Amino acid sequence: RKKIRIRAYPNTSDKNFYLEIKNSSVEGRFKTRKILNKKMVNFYEKAGIFDNQYGTCLPNFYVIYEREYSMIGDVRISIDKNLVYKNYRTDTFYNDTSLIVEIKTSIKKNLDDLIKLFPFQRIRFSKYCFAVDNLSQ
């Protein structure tokens, strides 16, 4: 599985744009990240991003949200809220009142300990897939 996205952090001191490519395979997860200037972002929005596996990738959706971070020991928690999913081509959008909580820690962390600390139901969730399901026409 591969994710190709341009990302920004508008409500932080980080004013950069990033081209992120995330690969998930049986060997593990790998992420590359390249800083882009606004001119490159505009170019990629119009011309697309060429990928050897997928060809030219054009933007489909914007996903906008607020993110808060917390640390509990060696566990990082991110909470996403005020999510807005927007179809790039049609400008239709979906406001989502859900909260998305993500927990990250080192691979050495014992899963049983995590389940005791955070007794939530675990689900796999993709903001992009949610946008596809709710905004595709």
Residue ranges and their predicted role:
Residues 1-137:
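Phosphate-end processing signature that detects enzymes handling 5′-triphosphorylated RNA
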